[in-house]
């Protein structure tokens, strides 16, 4: 594993940041809430926290140096079949010939049809070394996304999906370039 990470880091400078598209998925739920807060000194912080039933969804997207691409919300958890359909129907049409798609080394990302759809769009597919979320800048975007979801505290599925659609615009190009840079990639083409 350490050797695979070393090889990946050696190859990183040769990757054109304008061509990189990092793809991943994360969960979102109707029970998301902040776990910490502030109140005036001596005053107890009181806020509503959801208990009981909630609904979990999956948010799938790609991250480029200039923004989020091909965002989709899936009802429930994602599996290999749904991920392959996402790549064919949403991601591949959003790619530009010559792009390099980078994904985690998960079984559902290696489902039949995923590589074919990406290569059919004139792009290349690379898998990150196992256990390397630090090399995937979309993880930083998802961290911000979840903080914004917790702050909003949406409690309905429809509201959660609408909120996710609006929050996609909260990732301007300069911020996306910082995510790439933080993960060790060149943030601008040389």
Language-model regions, residue ranges each:
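Short functional hotspots at interaction and active-site rims
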Residues: 1-190
